[in-house]
Amino acid sequence: MHHTIKHLLETTLGFSVVLEKPKDKNHGHYATPAAFSLAKELKKNPALIAQELSKKLSEIEVFESVQSVGGYINFRLKQGFLDAQASLALSQGREFGKGDKQGSILLEYVSANPTGPLHIGHARGAVLGDALSRIGRHLGYALETEYYVNDAGNQIHLLGLSIYLAGRDSLLSLPVTYPEQYYRGEYIVDIAKEALKKWGEKAFADEAFIPELSLFGKELMLEEIRSNLADTHIHFDHYVSEKSLYPRWEETYALLQSHQGCYEGGGKVWLRSSAHGDEKDRVIVRESGEPTYLAGDIIYHADKFARPYDRYINIWGADHHGYIARVKAAIEFLGHDSSKLEVLLSQMVTLLKGGQPYKMSKRAGNFILMRDVLEDIGADALRFIFLSKKPDTHLEFDVDDLNKEDSSNPIFYINYAHARIHTMLGKSSLDSQEIEAASLEGLEDSIFDLLFLSLQLPQVLEDSFENRAIQKVAEYLRALAGEFHKFYNEHKILETPQEAALLKVCKVVALSLSQGLALLGITAKERM
């Protein structure tokens, strides 16, 4: 609907316009500041220009009224037009809000090391990435998702060593000497138990078996990670192994050299990242000749950019903020346009339970596990709360609040609105065809305001995706549910002369609620 109105304005005026929603809904459904952009060019008062434009725009058939206020031009849509838009939305069903955006996007997120279970920080980025992918695809983008598996380097050896030590110490009571760094937690002992079942005591007899334990532990962790993600309604198109890319290091290194992107110094190889906005140059090959963690990321981004997507989006933890400049510098030195890479940062999460800090997992030591919170509040509540705030802001919530059955629990509040509508539809003697064919003529303005709000979903989806502000969808759904509950409490709907018309409005509300929730990866409930 937004695009329809914008097209009508531009066709009538002959130039591009910005279409906004007035801050005060009493001013109308839409507004444009077009007069302000023309004022400088025409050297005239914006208010006078707005008055002149208003006369021209009054000729557009779908406008009930066109008013100029302080240079802004406000429009109110005709009820018949809104009725037609309601019928169109209902005929589209699950296609409602679907776009025809062009362009390909590779979205990489989570990419947690396969050395331990997913914690609640991983979960926030996971949910954000999945919601972005769902909305992006619905808008028409050719979007693919990817998980980068960090299965090379010292952390994988450390995983195998930790399993080896746990097996000797906790299972076989053999003497061990723990190093300063190793992975702790019950999950390590659990993997050691599985290794004991598979290989017997020989798995812990000699350190030569550590590489086998590393591979075994990595595969078990990846299996658990995939399971946690699936239980949160998250699936990836691709899993890319860091280890599988390492044979390409020499050619990647040669490419960096060919673009004067690296140099040797102090027995190390340095990325000349300060030339592209980083605060200093970074080591990519140690004195030992071993590539650094950054080198692995450079190979991965070389692989990414060799696949010709129009845009690349990474979702990283906020602690990786300083990493952006060095990766973008590497992309430039590989001969690619680093502006095609966009990095979104996901901030920390603080969990409470009954007002007290949420207990850390015994299984994983100093972490709150994604699995524990899933079992506490369920995937739908977890997803909604993580999507309710900007990802780059700190999030704190009490899980007990998400188990409440009242308006303080946003996911309950939204689902209750959706379920109320389905309950009414089930009780009504009218069939779907009768309801959808009903005329809305004669309904009061406040009901058309509710209908107008329910028809905003397509634009909310587009704005939220393009601005990477998925919280706007959550805010919209909560606002729509609130307006519906108000309408429900103020109107008798069933067994009235206007039953069909009122239920038609309700069906559009339900469509937007269910569609919006689905694109957040949440199931809308029809019964509660």
UniProtKB/Swiss-Prot annotation:
Q: Which molecular function GO terms apply here?
A: arginine-tRNA ligase activity; ATP binding
One Pfam family, short name = tRNA-synt_1d
- Give the residue interval(s) assigned to the motif 'HIGH' region: 112-122
* PROSITE patterns hit by this protein: AA_TRNA_LIGASE_I
Its GO biological process annotations read:
arginyl-tRNA aminoacylation
Q: Does the keyword Aminoacyl-tRNA synthetase apply?
A: yes
Q: Which UniProt keywords apply?
A: Aminoacyl-tRNA synthetase, ATP-binding, Cytoplasm, Ligase, Nucleotide-binding, Protein biosynthesis
Enzyme class per UniProt: ligase
Q: What is its EC number?
A: 6.1.1.19
Q: Which InterPro entries does the UniProt entry name for this protein? A: aa-tRNA-synth_I_CS, Arg-tRNA-ligase, Arg-tRNA-synth_N, Arg-tRNA-synth_N_sf, ArgRS_core, DALR_anticod-bd, Rossmann-like_a/b/a_fold, tRNAsynth_Ia_anticodon-bd
Name the reaction it catalyses.
tRNA(Arg) + L-arginine + ATP = L-arginyl-tRNA(Arg) + AMP + diphosphate
Q: Where in the cell is it found?
A: Cytoplasm
The answer, when asked if DNA-binding is one of the entry's keywords, is no
Q: Which GO terms describe its cellular component?
A: cytoplasm
Indicate the family of this protein: Belongs to the class-I aminoacyl-tRNA synthetase family.
Q: How does it assemble?
A: Monomer.
Question: Which HAMAP family would you find in this protein's record?
Answer: Arg_tRNA_synth
The protein here is known as Arginine--tRNA ligase
Q: Which gene codes for it?
A: argS
